[in-house]
């Protein structure tokens, strides 16, 4: 399956969604590795108070509202991983200070992505993350999906 999808269950149920609005995505992986097992073990003992705003993301996609998509991001694993690896929070903060509409850890970490409206701002964030030696690998991607027929 191609394009934007909603994954449910353990990823086995995929539902096609409207495309992601045109944007730039900055991806930064710090020079660490994270044990997914450790994250899930600690998650079980952690109280989860906030959950991703799935409805907000779905509405943002439907309305092609990039700000709403970015504002609705959430990852319940992030709290656990950031406690063990504060560099993840530093990367997010750097991206947000550089103009990201939203930034979030991907999966159980350690990779962080930031959503940017334009390439200039995303490149500035790329330069800042690199200058602070926060990430070992940094990539900039252009998202420009076309609507499904």
Per-region residue spans from a language model:
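Conserved, helical-rich catalytic subdomain that frames metal- and/or nucleotide-binding sites
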Residues: 2, 7-102, 117-120, 126-130, ...
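Conserved SAM-binding loop
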Residues: 104-105, 114
């Amino acid at each position: 399956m191609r394009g934007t999808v909603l994954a449910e269950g353990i990823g086995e149920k995929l539902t096609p969604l409207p495309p992601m609005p045109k944007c730039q995505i900055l991806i930064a992986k710090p020079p660490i590795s994270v044990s997914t097992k450790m994250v899930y073990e600690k998650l079980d003992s952690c109280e989860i108070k906030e959950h991703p705003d799935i409805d907000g993301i779905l509405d943002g996609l439907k309305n092609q509202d990039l700000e709403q998509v970015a504002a609705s991001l959430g990852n319940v694993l992030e709290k656990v991983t950031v406690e063990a690896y504060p560099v993840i929070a530093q990367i997010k903060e750097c991206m947000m200070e550089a103009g990201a509409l939203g930034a979030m850890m991907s999966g159980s970490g350690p990779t962080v992505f930031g959503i940017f409206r334009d390439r200039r701002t995303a490149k500035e964030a790329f330069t800042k993350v690199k200058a602070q030696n926060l990430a070992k690998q940094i990539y900039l991607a252009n998202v420009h999906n076309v609507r499904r027929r």
